[in-house]
Amino acid sequence: MKRKGFIKQIFGVTADGRVEQLSELHIPAGTRVVQSFLISTLFEDNGASFKKVILPNSVKEIEHAAFANIRAEQVLFKNGLEKIDGYAFRGVGIRSENLVFPKTLKSIGHYAFAENRIPKFSQDNSLKKVTLPQNCEYYKDSFDPTTEVVGGKLIEE
């Protein structure tokens, strides 16, 4: 069965498995779901580092650990995104002072942005502040304890 809107291939990996140094990772337009472990499996072991990860407005969901442990200084979320599953961006090292999410975002899973530290300065939390739409549900552990969360609805467990 052919599934439309799923990433099938990412360019930038050489035939022998090395990653070409990419400054930006663009998820293809039309992609609706970034599957679990997809990006992290392709790039984590290769030491890839990106200035930006750019998601098109067609992406509705980012599944469990899709981007976990890759390096990306900035992630650009577009309107249309509704759900970020647990561990999706765990350990990514986003260096944004204020990460703003689209108004369409409804939920952020457990540990989605946890352990988001710059590797050279492991005690420094690089994600200082996040701004969520008022209707977006998140957990206390969705972000590191030192990250300021503005907006959203905290789910008490």
For the regions a language model picked out, list residue spans one by one.
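Structural signature of tandem-repeat unit edges
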Residues: 1, 5, 17-33, 44-61, ...
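Surface-exposed repetitive/solenoidal architectures
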Residues: 11-14, 35-40, 66
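Short, intrinsically disordered, low-complexity terminal segments
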Residues: 12, 63-65, 69, 85, ...
